[in-house]
Amino acid sequence: MCAQQGVSLYRRYLNAGIMEEGLVSPRTQGVPQGSPLSPLLSNVMLTELDWEIESRGLSHVRYADDCNIYVKSEKAAQRVLNSITQYVEGELKLRVNRDKSGTFRPKDSTFLGYTFSKADSKRIVVAEKSMKRLWTKLHKMFNSARGTSLKKTIERLTPVLRGWRNYYRLDTRKQFWNEMDERIRHHLRELIWIAWKRPKTRAQNLIKLGLDLETAWKSSVNGRGAWWNSGQAHMNLTIKNARFARLGLYSLRFMAIC
């Protein structure tokens, strides 16, 4: 696509109407939030900002209108923030959102779901907010999976886990991904324990899966909750990791980029 075709496509998109209750009304200003045109227009408008930052010898990263600039001290950060704000508003005639702008230590900032490790400032890792969003989604999936077959539950988990892992592939902490895998399997074992319902059924299934008679019965009537039991030896020894792997559970530790 040549430049003229690109400009023509942008203009057609900007002039497109807005669908409201089945009717198209004209758009007088702005771009639909979340549309693919937003980051493209941001790049058109902010390429000069990239050049300005690079001409000052500063390290930076930008996605659409979200930009981080890295300097060596808090004093330098404040100076750069002020001068870049003046440049954007004075030269580019754009407004800087001061509520979202500021100076931060790298380990306290988040960019596109990543942050810097507190233990190793040169390593980028998954941000805490990103983790919380994922587990909120997974908890809803696990709660709605009660009464559903294990295979079906794993099939529903797979695209979520694969997509999340591929996006956060720059986080290379082996222990972190191992712990994530373990926690997911813990939830799946909990679903199995809940599905067995009665102590007698639990004991019978544990025995079928290789646990000795005495341990199986003691485990089935211990009076503890499903989450506690699903993390104990009687479940880890009988519901092995290999079983989940055979059913197609996606491993965050041993990722395959798709």
Residue spans for each PLM region:
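Extended C-terminal regions of large enzymes
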Residues: 187, 196-258
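A conserved non-catalytic segment of reverse transcriptases
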Residues: 15, 87, 91-156, 160-162
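Short, solvent-exposed helix-loop connector elements
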Residues: 26-31, 122-123, 139-153, 164-176, ...
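Conserved polymerase palm-domain catalytic core
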Residues: 1-108
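Non-catalytic, well-ordered alpha-helical scaffold segments
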Residues: 4-11, 39, 43, 109, ...
